[in-house]
Amino acid sequence: MDDRYPGIFIPRLNKIQNRLPDVPFVSQWQEVPQDLICNAEDRECTDTTKHCQCFHVVKVPLNALVELVLVDVRPTRNADSDPPGVPPPTHIHHPFHLHGYYFNLVAQQQNPRNVTPSDIFNMVETGDIPLNLYRSPSKDTVGIPINGFVVLRFVADNPGPWFFHCHLGNHAVSKLYF
């Protein structure tokens, strides 16, 4: 959701809505304007009065261990303050798919209480969320539980640009990918 447009869903990863370049990145990456490319480290998108949109690229060193924590932030509905016509929150799983790799699903939970994504990131970092690091399932697509999260791990041993996106058609069209 975007605070400037109540009731309108604007999907974002790391507070960035992706914008594809006019040329295919896989084959013509040299032609992508550098000022279009960004990631969460070089573009701070914390101001909700601004719509942060760019070609969201995360550069990962070869053979690095990558850990992704994906959190489904479920919008809540307040009948007293929501403008008329605001639709109720959706109740769907987000199936995320990674091209070029298989990842290990090391944790998957519904949010047992109302905690923020930052709380979940901190709990993963401090070990308060147990990770299944042995015999965890290997996948290329995972469903994020409604109002829940997943923790994924893989080794970046297949160099090149790879697409990571929500597999729901309307979310892909609305740019829920990087």
What are these regions (language model features)?
Residues M1-F178:
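Copper-binding active sites and cupredoxin-like electron-transfer domains
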